Amino acid sequence: EFLMEWLPKQCNKHKWAPCTYQSNLGTVQNLIIPYIGDMQMQKLKPYHLEDLYATLGKTPCGQYYEGKKQVLSEKQQQRLLSGTTIHEVHRLLRTAFQYAVEWGILVKSPVPVDSPKKSTQERSIWDVGEMQAALASMEDPILHLAVHLTLVGALREGEVAGLTPEDIDFDAADGMGTFTINKSMQRIQKASLAKTGKDCILREFEDKREGSNTVLVLKKTKTASSCRTIFMTEALKNELKHWFKRLEMDEAVDPERYRNSGMLLRLPNGLAVEPVLIRKKFEKWQDAHPAFPHIVFHGLRHSSATYQLMISGGDVKAVQGTTGHASANLLVNTYAHIQQDSRKKLGKKFEEGFYKPGATPVQAAPVEAEPT
C-alpha cells in the first residue's frame, strides 16, 4: 500500500516520463507486491528482503504481469530474472524506505546495506562481417531500412521508428547527407500517461483497436545528449532516396484510403511502423537465418557502437556523438568488452613493438633461494 502511494508522489516530484513511471510501477506490481505485499512495513527486516532477492533470482521473467500470475511455457520458465533486474528492485526499495524514514513511518530502513550484484555477462553482438552479410540477406524493405539506419547511427529501436522525412537532409555536410535524432516512438500504458502528464509527448497516434489500454506516442528523446545528427553513408543515402519514391508510389495506389502517418517508416497503407513490429520482423528474419548468432534488435546498436569504437581507434568522444550516450564514461563502461579478433591483433602489435629485432632479449628473472 505504501509503495503504491509513494510512486505517484515521486512521479509528480521528479517529473517522471510515462515510461519511467510504467517501469517502476511494473517493478512494484510484479516483483515486490506478489512476494512481500502482505507483510507489515514495521515488521520487515533485512533478511526478509534478502529472501526476496534470492527468490527473484530463481523466478522466470514475466511470472507476473500487472500483478497477476501468468502461465508460462517450459521455454519461458527457463529464462530467469537477471541480476540487473534484482538490483533495480533493491534500488527502488532503498529509495522508497528512505522516504518512509524521512516521513516518520519507519524508524529505520529494512533494506540491506549490500545491493545484489548486477549481471556482468557480455552483450551478444555481431562483428562487421556478420552485420554486412545480415543486411545483404534482408529482403523485407522496412526491415532492411530500419536495420541499415540502426547500424549506421547506432540507434535505439524507438529512435529509428521515430524518424520523420523532415529529419532527412540529403544536402547537409557538403552533400554527404545527415539524419537527425530528436524524438522517439513508444507504446505506453494510458494509465501511466494519465499519471505523468504529457509534457514530454509530442504526438499521440490514433488507435483503432477498441478497448486498448495502451497508446502509441512520439515523445522527446531520453536525454539532451540523445539529440544528435548522424552522417549518412552513400549506400544509406541511395536507399533512403529509393524509399521516398516507394512512399510516393504507395500513396498513389489509393490516395483516398492512404493514411499518411507522417513517419519515415510506414506500412503500405501509410500507418506508422512501431518498434514492436520492427522487433517482430527482426525475430522472424533470425528464425529464418539460424546461421547468424542470435541477438536482440537492440544488439544491433551495440554491434554498431563496438565497431565504431574499433575503427576510430578508441575515439570515445566521436563515437559518443553518434550513439547519444549521456557521458563518455557510460559509453566506455557499456562497451568495455572487445571482440576476440581485436584482442588477437592487439597481442600481435604488442609483440611486434615490445620485442623489436635487435633489442636486448628479455631475460627471465633469476629465482632466488628462500632465506633459511
Feature-to-residue mapping (PLM):
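Proline-centered turn/helix-capping motifs that create local helix->coil transitions or kinks
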Residues: 100-110, 170-173, 187-193, 242-256, ...
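Phosphate-coordinating loops and pocket residues in cytosolic domains that bind phosphorylated ligands
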Residues: 4, 43-46, 58, 107, ...
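Conserved hydrophobic/aromatic pocket- or pore-lining residues that grip, position, or stack substrates
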Residues: 32, 49, 93-96, 104, ...
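C-terminal secondary-structure termini that scaffold catalytic or DNA-interacting sites
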Residues: 167-173, 183-227, 236, 269, ...
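Short, basic (Lys/Arg/His-rich) helix/loop patches that form interaction surfaces
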Residues: 61-65, 136, 140-141, 153, ...
